[in-house]
């Protein structure tokens, strides 16, 4: 969404397409917080292989959480645009403030919020295989960022083709 769509262009279907569960579903944030607290209370122990295995598992979970943040960011942006359109905001101004709020939630600068939202939109709309690989822990958020950044000059169709080609070779991710 570039903010130039008509107000009726932001629909609930867009939020569903972003991969976020509909309203009424208990958010995972409570469970995630409980898991984080539990992990913080456990002292590292075990042999070297066990420690490395846990580090890998945690890295995979970080990737899955980054993918979830991307989906939530896209859904939030779409929801904000719809609310602003319903309030009569000019089409060119739709989405104002969304990236800054995402940045605040992620404890990042407002400028980085624009980059994070751009990354999320690219993954959700043009690079679904990269997003799926991120969710599966096949690559981390930084590597996903590099893929999005290096394909930024391509058309949406070409970017999607690169995404599909890279997905065929899971070792690439």
Each language-model region and where it sits:
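Peripheral, non-cofactor segments flanking catalytic/redox cores
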Residues: 1-173
């Amino acid at each position: 969404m570039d903010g130039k769509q008509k107000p009726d262009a932001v629909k609930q279907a867009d939020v569903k397409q972003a991969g976020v569960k509909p309203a009424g579903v208990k958010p995972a944030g409570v469970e995630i917080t409980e898991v984080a607290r539990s992990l913080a209370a456990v002292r590292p122990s075990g042999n070297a292989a066990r420690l490395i295995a846990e580090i890998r598992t945690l890295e995979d979970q970080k990737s899955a959480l980054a993918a979830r943040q991307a989906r939530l960011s896209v859904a939030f942006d779409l929801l904000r645009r719809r609310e602003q359109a319903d309030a009569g905001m000019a089409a060119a101004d739709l989405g104002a403030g969304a990236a800054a709020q995402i940045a605040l939630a992620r404890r990042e600068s407002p400028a980085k919020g624009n980059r994070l939202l751009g990354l999320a939109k690219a993954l959700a709309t043009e690079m679904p295989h990269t997003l799926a690989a991120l969710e599966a822990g096949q690559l981390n958020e930084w590597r996903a960022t590099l893929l999005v950044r290096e394909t930024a000059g391509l058309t949406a169709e070409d970017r999607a083709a690169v995404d599909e080609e890279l997905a065929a070779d899971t070792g690439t991710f």
